[in-house]
């Protein structure tokens, strides 16, 4: 099956912030946790989907292998080894439902593996009205499997109109900002929020780079990193 590129068109998409202890919410739907971590060699995980509304909500939950292109778009590929139970559930008002999942067998590779659990609200036939389009909600939860030693390792290079930041490490990072400093010590900070997956890269638009760019610093949820700049 062809990969799907995640879109928020006609959907209310709640981005799951890593490290948060609060549930991710979209309308009346919520999920907890907002990021799932599975230890190396393990397969099982779970997710609680809540309905804070005043009417029943039916949801479909699916698991996808997850990657990102260098423009920052999520690529979701159906993964038959990612099993979700139940895949479809109706949740009563002000109630919640536990969803269990089983990941594909661990291949033993040292690099972190990543998926996304997608929770989609399904149309409610009782709410259908002629000429009215229902707004359906979506929640997207990242799932990571890695050992405790997994960590990012960044390099950077100049790309047309921006800076290409690559992660050659074994673990992901949730980037929050990138600071560029020139030889005179003048710094420009770009507030950017994105996941940089293990083995992945992203081009960060910068416009014109500082003359004599001398240092790059990435601030992420995992810490702050001085990033070497590759010379042409």
Language model regions located:
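Bacterial N-terminal signal peptides
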Residues: 8-18
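Sec/Tat signal peptide C-region and signal peptidase I cleavage site
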Residues: 20-26
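Surface-exposed binding patches on compact interaction domains or structured appendages
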Residues: 27-30, 52-98
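Asparagine-centered strand-capping/turn motif at beta-strand->loop junctions
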Residues: 47-53, 163-171
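Short aromatic-acidic-glycine turn motif
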Residues: 65-78, 126-127, 181-189
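Intrinsically disordered, low-complexity Pro/Gly/Ser/Thr-rich segments with frequent PxxP/GP/PP motifs
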Residues: 74-107, 186-211
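Terminal connector regions
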Residues: 104-150, 210-232
């Amino acid at each position: 099956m062809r990969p799907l590129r995640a879109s928020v068109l006609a959907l209310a998409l709640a981005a799951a912030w890593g490290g948060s202890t609060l549930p991710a919410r979209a309308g009346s739907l919520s999920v907890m946790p907002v990021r799932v971590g599975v230890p190396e060699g393990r397969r099982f995980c779970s997710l609680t989907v809540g309905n804070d509304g005043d009417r029943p909500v039916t949801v479909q939950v699916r698991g996808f292998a997850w990657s990102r292109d260098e423009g920052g778009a999520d690529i979701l590929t159906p993964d038959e080894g990612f099993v979700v139970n139940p895949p479809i559930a109706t949740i009563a008002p002000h109630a919640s439902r536990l969803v269990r999942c089983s990941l594909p067998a661990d291949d033993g590779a040292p690099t972190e593996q990543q998926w996304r659990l997608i929770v989609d609200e399904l149309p409610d036939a009782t709410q259908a009205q002629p000429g009215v389009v229902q707004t359906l909600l979506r929640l997207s939860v990242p799932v990571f499997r890695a050992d405790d030693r997994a960590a990012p390792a960044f390099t950077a290079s100049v790309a047309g109109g921006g800076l290409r930041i690559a992660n050659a490490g074994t673990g992901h990072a949730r980037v929050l900002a990138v600071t560029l400093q020139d030889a005179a010590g003048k710094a420009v900070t770009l507030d950017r929020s994105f996941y940089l997956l293990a083995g992945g890269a992203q081009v960060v638009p910068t416009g014109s780079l500082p003359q004599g760019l001398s240092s790059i610093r990435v601030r992420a949820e995992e810490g702050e990193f001085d990033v070497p700049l590759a010379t042409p």
